[in-house]
Amino acid sequence: MYKNQLQELAQRSCFNLPSYACIREGPDHAPRFKATVNFNGETFESPAFCSTLRLAEHAAAEVALNELSKRGPSSSLAAKVLDETGIYKNLLQETAHRAGLKLPVYTTIRSGPGHTPVFTCTVELAGMTFTGNPGKTKKQAQKNAAMAAWSELKQLPRVGEPSSSSCPPDHDDDDQEQIIVARTLASLNQTNGGKTPQQKEKQQSSNRPSSRRPSYPKSNASFYGRLHLQKHAYPSVPPEQAMYHMWHQVQATQQKPHFPMVPTMGSTGFPPPPTVLHMYPPPRGQFTMPSSQDGLGLIPCYPEASPVLPRYFSPYPASFVPRRPLPVNVHKIHEKRLVGADMVELPDAAVFSRYTAPDFSGTSENAVQDNKKEEYTESSPASEQESKSHTASSSATRSPSQQLESNQDIEIMGGLRLESKKPAEQPPESSPSRVNPVLLCETGQRHHYSSVRHGDPVHRNSPQISVATSPSPIRRGDPAHINIPQISVATPPECRSPRAQAPPRFGTRMPVNLPSSLYQQRPPWLAASVTIRTTIPVCSARPNVVNSSAGAAQPAVQILSASPRKEEPEARTNTSDTSNAATASSELNKLHI
């Protein structure tokens, strides 16, 4: 410590750094040291021998500082050096740490005018307060207080002083003094019970009964008021029991909201469900909600001194109440979904049963397995009689112009009719002049034929395509196949797929595979029915030529009949009539030529 101060003084005075010389005496197991210091050409010697070299050097530096501080111009400089180094503040802190005490606390007071303030500092250590000389700065006042504290601590009765000391007690080293002061402070702390006088005073004041009236919080005022009334009403009840019961009553009332309610705009008109009313019961004694006022449109206003919020009070607004419980909504959604599923799964047969006639061309797989016997679907006798009468009338002497007009009328009325005709004898497959506009689909796809009368309306979404072919003359060598009637064919969505095959060449036939399911749901992406009319020009026929009946014509799509043998006589009669008409027309042509 003193060595550092002497070195700083030399640096400020622009002197050379001090140099130390040591003298050793005594045996090796107990050596003694004496040091001398050279400061600015002057030599200062330690007053006595010391046990260590470091202590001897510090003693020599202390003697040099004391001598220099007493001299003329250098005295002020030495005093400043000793003051500015803050050595005493460090001494106090180290001593308190060794003694196991709290660190020293400095309190500075400012006084005097503003342009020339004066600071006075006091330091507290081990329950003792020391006041230093005033200073111009706060730092200077703290250093003065530390110097005053250290000087007073050194004057205390020493405890634990070493019995054998090589140095006299008047010239103890600073480290030795620090150890002695630390022991003294520790012994004083033990005698005081480890508590400072201020702590003892605080403890005594806390143990004293307070003469002031206790200030209770506002929220508990009702509790103590009720307790006072309870004492007057029941003087025989012990105060502890009365306090216990009153505390429970206050807790029960505090759990309910005591907030004044203010109506909000846009309050709903429906009554709250019982679950919400159970969660938010009305307050007692402070607010009574009229029956005409909506309870959900009221929100709480928080007063300044409000009690503790209840536990169930959530951050969500109380005005939000669901109209119906959640299970009811889920049940209704299920019902809607089930109704939609029933509407989707409804087959077209039930929807179009009013407009479609029963199918004659349906064949079942079971009939094919049993010796290839085919069955007709049941049809009404009225439709069979109508088809037979229409076949008979068409096989009569009807001119091609009249037949063409009737076909046009049928198409204008918007009815799509499939005329059930008896299959005639098949011509040889090698006839190149016969044209069969066959509508094909892949194997296993469904073909659907439906006939609609003229008066019946047609469903807009029914996937039907009407293929109308005007009568065209065929080679005169085949009198049985003169013209092709108008046929309305309803194709399912599978037939419109891009994988559909191309129509076969002329003169070829292709059987139609009809599965057991005749009706099929139309996808929503299909358009309405389209009518396609194809006309083949007549080259060799004249207007007055009588064409054969439509009943003997080969249909565009061949339908396998279940009983072909029963209709053979009628087909033969139609063939003979057609051949007679053909020969008559050829003779008339020759006569005209």
Curated annotation (Swiss-Prot):
Task: Give a yes or no for keyword RNA-binding in this entry.
Answer: yes
The region called Disordered is annotated at 188-221, 357-408, 546-593
Chain's role = Binds double-stranded RNA.
Q: Where is the DRBM domain?
A: 1-70, 87-155
The source's superkingdom equals: Eukaryota
UniProt KW Repeat keyword = yes
Pfam families (alphabetical): dsrm (PF00035)
* The name this protein goes by in its record: Double-stranded RNA-binding protein 2
Q: Which SUPFAM superfamilies match?
A: dsRNA-binding domain-like (SSF54768)
> Where does this protein have compositionally biased stretches of type Polar residues?
188-197, 378-408
Under the GO molecular function aspect, what terms does this record hold?
Answer: double-stranded RNA binding
Q: Which spans does this entry mark as compositional bias, Low complexity?
A: 205-219, 572-586
Gene that produces this protein: DRB2
Q: Which UniProt keywords apply?
A: Repeat, RNA-binding
